[in-house]
């Protein structure tokens, strides 16, 4: 990954969280009862290959937010960190794919890390846009995710995991820290089949 893409990912995922928190926290502390909610990712708990900068940025959000939560204990402001699993948003449709994620795009569709075309289970080559749409449609409804987050805030949960996939991956990482990756791969293959990929 080139330096521009590295900095872009960190600016979006991590530096924006710091800037937002630093800007709004003083105002929140003046109110009677408030909450600051930062979004990390399940990829701030587990790791996968070929996503180094994304993991680094999401782990950084986790560290920043959980440390801030400890500093703010006893104050009028609750600090929460959200760890979403697969949510049905347009993030994959609008994603900026660096050379770490896909090798490129041919006229027929995207090329995977091995340089081979990405195909669905029927053998049809898939465009980058179509891959993003399928990913979105297979995820949890965003309204349901929002309700889970609000419920977590009301219960004053410092860590809010959204989706059964996020909960399972977090548990597997804690119980099997050296081998959880095999479970993650199995789950990923299952989800890929459900969304129409080999």
At which residue positions do the language-model features occur?
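Substrate-binding pocket helix/loop in short-chain dehydrogenase/reductase
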Residues: 2-7
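Residue(s) in the substrate-gating loop at a strand-loop-helix junction
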Residues: 41
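Active-site loop immediately N-terminal to the catalytic Tyr-X3-Lys motif
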Residues: 46-53
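Conserved small/polar residues in nucleotide/adenosyl-binding loops
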Residues: 188-195
């Amino acid at each position: 990954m080139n330096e521009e893409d590295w900095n872009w990912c960190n600016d979006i995922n991590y530096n924006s969280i710091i800037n937002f928190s630093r800007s709004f926290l003083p105002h929140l502390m003046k109110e009677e009862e408030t909450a600051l909610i930062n979004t990390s990712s399940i990829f701030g708990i587990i790791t996968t290959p070929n996503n180094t900068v994304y993991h680094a940025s999401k782990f950084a959000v986790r560290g920043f937010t959980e440390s801030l939560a400890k500093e703010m204990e006893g104050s009028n402001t609750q600090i929460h960190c959200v760890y979403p699993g697969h949510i049905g948003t347009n993030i994959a449709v609008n994603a900026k794919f660096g050379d770490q994620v896909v090798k490129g795009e041919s006229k027929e569709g995207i090329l995977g890390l091995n340089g081979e075309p990405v195909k669905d289970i029927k053998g049809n080559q898939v465009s980058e846009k179509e891959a993003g749409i399928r990913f979105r449609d297979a995820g949890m409804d965003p309204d349901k995710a929002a309700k889970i987050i609000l419920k977590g805030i009301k219960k004053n949960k410092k860590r809010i995991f959204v989706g059964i996939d996020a909960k399972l991956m977090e548990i597997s990482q804690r119980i099997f820290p050296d081998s959880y990756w095999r479970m993650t791969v199995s789950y990923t293959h299952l989800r890929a089949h459900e969304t129409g990929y080999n």
